[in-house]
Amino acid sequence: MSAPDLFVAHFREAVPYIRQMRGKTLVAGIDDRLLEGDTLNKLAADIGLLSQLGIRLVLIHGARHFLDRHAAAQGRTPHYCRGLRVTDETSLEQAQQFAGTVRSRFEAALCGSVSGFARAPSVPLVSGNFLTARPIGVIDGTDMEYAGVIRKTDTAALRFQLDAGNIVWLPPLGHSYSGKTFYLDMLQTAASAAVSLQAEKLVYLTLSDGISRPDGTLAETLSAQEAQSLAEHAGGETRRLISSAVAALEGGVHRVQILNGAADGSLLQELFTRNGIGTSIAKEAFVSIRQAHSGDIPHIAALIRPLEEQGILLHRSREYLENHISEFSILEHDGNLYGCAALKTFAEADCGEIACLAVSPQAQDGGYGERLLAHIIDKARGIGISRLFALSTNTGEWFAERGFQTASEDELPETRRKDYRSNGRNSHILVRRLHR
């Protein structure tokens, strides 16, 4: 595929996700190691692009690794309790200095990301005392000193800024009602802000590719329950990351995504492609199959039209779909329709037919056809069908590889046999015996 064709294909794939995210809130928790050099510039450019696409953005950065480096340079050993930093007065002052410096750098990078365009819209970045904090106190006998936790989030003020089109920038600092300043953990703060705003997505930008399974492979999608199971075998930081992600999901955040922010364009790839690039965690499973309803008809028609034009599927009018929608099941990935299949029944109670099995060209490698077939088989078994037919002009081998055997016209139910003879397609007939 040529470069222009690739661009068109990728842009078309991105459009539904852009539409889905426009006007929605995204909270990003940013590892402080990403806020320097060329990585900062590229991240700022992508953040600016998201803002101009109409996405409401709240950015929270950490300071842990900066503080650890400074402590080591000064011969001091940082102390942690349950993964939270014990923050003395020196560390707090350094965190305040870092917060001011990194905000200035990010503002400059954000301005630079749009400066090459005439009449480029500004991308305002705002901060404020949106977070009220309190001291953590003592944990397991350890005084956490100036380490704090969020007591209250001024959600109304945050929404006011987001409504105005501003990007909200939150440092890892919060102030108490007594006027003291406390250092905040980035993971917890990002999750808390996302819950307060009921954000569509919480994205953690880290230096890892996502959450790994015990065998070392990347877990691309996880339910909250699956993520918690992985946390039991993970290291301390990964365990805290998963814990914050699950807390956000349980608080009403729609999706949590964990990705390598140092990889150029990773944020855009994660948000605007079907499979993403990191680990995406949802409260429930990502791919689901459900009964179709009348509202799905335009999407089903659009999905099967190319296959009808190629002669792979028999043409089905809108009227046909309206009258037979109860036969259809649809497969959704992340809320988007990627496949459909129908189960037709006949007077002969033990016979059924899987029909109109279709998967979007953008999802041919996702195993969705297998899932739809398994769903139809389970559905057929549930209503007492013992023989499931498939009629195909050019996918007979696919069905044969999945337990279907060549059958004769005489084995079709009588009403289906009449249709078969009249439509002139001369489809291959296959049947699979279903065992209870």
Curated annotation (Swiss-Prot):
One of its GO terms (biological process) is L-arginine biosynthetic process. The gene is argA. Pathway: Amino-acid biosynthesis; L-arginine biosynthesis; N(2)-acetyl-L-ornithine from L-glutamate: step 1/4. Belongs to the acetyltransferase family. ArgA subfamily. InterPro entries: AceGlu_kinase-like_sf, Acyl_CoA_acyltransferase, Asp/Glu/Uridylate_kinase, GNAT_dom, NAGS_kin, NH2A_AcTrfase. PROSITE patterns: GNAT. This is Amino-acid acetyltransferase. Residues 287-436 form the N-acetyltransferase domain. In bacteria which possess the bifunctional enzyme ornithine acetyltransferase/N-acetylglutamate synthase (ArgJ), ArgA fulfills an anaplerotic role. HAMAP family: N_acetyl_glu_synth (MF_01105).
